[in-house]
Regions:
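Catalytic-site signature of metal-activated, phosphate-bearing donor transferases
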Residues: 96-103, 109, 115-116, 122-247, ...
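Conserved donor nucleotide-binding strand/loop of the catalytic core
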Residues: 73-104
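A conserved acidic beta->alpha catalytic loop
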Residues: 48, 52, 60-72, 90-91, ...
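Short, well-formed alpha-helical segments that are part of the catalytic scaffolds
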Residues: 37-56
């Protein structure tokens, strides 16, 4: 009898690699975090949630060889969190592994209302606001909600707040997405700040190499899938393999897909051609201009292509020989609102600084002093730079002379 009990106990130990700690107490939100070798990021990633009073956590480790799991246990122990589970399972692909994490959350946290699925080095601002939002939304049936991810150079939205009862799941081996997410966004003041540590940058480089291999394999299986083609091109662009990126963006331009990806494809083609034209005569500014113009035509409320066009006509060291063309594109860019409803790859710098900075210079040359002064003041709100202070002084002097 004792021998049988020992065998049963051993079997139970090896049925699952889950490490479970008192999961009966559940709130409106359970944090679901998929990680691998994130020992240096775990505390900072998890801390905002603990400080805001969230007590339910599922950590899905896909093969850490560092101290990620030990650091996580220590963190929860230090903060007296007992309602957590650590699951271990080898990485498969991003959609499959995330879906397995959600399956584990369903199993261990059956009474929670929402899962917030994030990555390490995604630092959530306004966790209290998220809790309040979830309490307001908990009796509705929206399957998932978009949350912003921002840093100094990018602003986009992803469906990572998931209603547990919807059983919504991800698709896509890389740059996975939940196809039923719709367009309901959490309030703008609830957002992830994307970490940019040296540690994170090194991990990004390794991930791009892995992503490229996964996407290329998927592309070979289904060469007409527009999302796969787009992200294969984008991954090569991130890796610095610009000609490969150009090839796949050109292919993506022939495939009809999501309208924001259609726009982004032509915008990135313009950027790549403009960059290559500096060293390769096979790429020219008229080619880049056509791509930028197509992008703007697809989404005329977006300023980024116009900003690139404006800067082209005011190149460093050349001066205002094309000031009128520069002014034309810069002024239109400054008339556009920040695209709050868009989800994909907004460039905050183009809206908060660049468009105003270039109009500050161009407006003077064409005699539009009022708009030039306004643009200068707007640019200075983002960056107090010496040439802008000089421009402002010139505009103020000019205005005083006209009075």
């Amino acid at each position: 009898m004792k021998k049988s009990l020992v065998v049963i106990t051993l079997l139970l130990l090896f049925v699952s690699r889950a490490q479970t700690n008192n999961v009966e107490e559940q709130g409106v939100i359970t944090i679901v975090l998929m990680v691998k070798n994130e020992q240096d990021a775990m505390e900072k990633t998890l801390e905002p949630f603990v400080k805001a009073g969230i007590k339910s956590f599922l950590i899905f480790d896909t093969g850490s060889t560092d101290d990620t799991i030990a650091v996580t246990h220590q963190f929860f122990k230090k903060h007296h969190i007992t309602n957590y589970v650590i699951e271990e399972e080898p990485f498969i692909d991003f959609a499959t592994s995330r879906n397995h994490a959600l399956d584990a959350a369903d199993k261990h946290f059956p009474n929670t209302t929402f899962y917030l699925m994030l990555d390490a080095e995604w630092y959530l601002h306004n966790v209290k606001g998220l809790i309040d939002f979830c309490n307001l939304e908990k009796h509705k049936n929206t399957p998932c909600y978009l949350l912003r991810i921002i840093n100094n150079s990018i602003d986009f939205s992803v469906p990572r707040l998931i209603r547990a009862s919807s059983h919504a799941r991800f698709e896509g081996v890389v740059h996975e997405i939940i196809p039923v997410y719709g367009s309901v966004k959490a309030p703008r003041d609830i957002y992830f700040e994307l970490g940019v540590s040296h540690y994170g940058i090194e991990k990004s480089r390794k991930r791009w190499e892995r992503d490229a291999a996964l996407l290329l394999k998927e592309h070979e299986k289904n060469p007409t899938a527009p999302r796969t083609t787009f992200y294969l091109a984008q991954t090569y662009e991130c890796m610095g393999e610009i000609e490969k990126a150009f090839h796949y963006y050109k292919l993506r331009a022939t495939q009809e897909g999501w309208h924001e990806e259609n726009y982004e494809t032509f915008y990135r083609l313009g950027r790549i051609v403009e960059r290559l034209s500096a060293t390769d005569p096979n790429y020219t500014w008229p080619m880049a201009f056509e791509y930028f113009a197509t992008a703007h035509n697809l989404m005329p409320h977006r300023a980024e292509p116009l900003v690139h066009m404006a800067y082209h006509y005011w190149p460093d060291g050349v001066g205002p020989s094309n000031a009128a063309l520069c002014y034309l594109f810069a002024k239109r860019a400054c008339e556009l609102d920040y695209p709050e409803k868009d989800m994909l790859f907004i460039d905050p710098g183009a809206y908060n600084f660049k468009r105003y900075e270039i109009l500050s210079k161009a407006a003077w040359q064409v005699g539009d002093f009022a708009n030039g002064e306004t643009a200068t003041r707007n640019a200075l709100q983002a960056h107090e730079m010496p040439h802008l202070l000089n421009n402002l002084a010139a505009y103020i002097t000019r205005r005083a002379q006209q009075q």
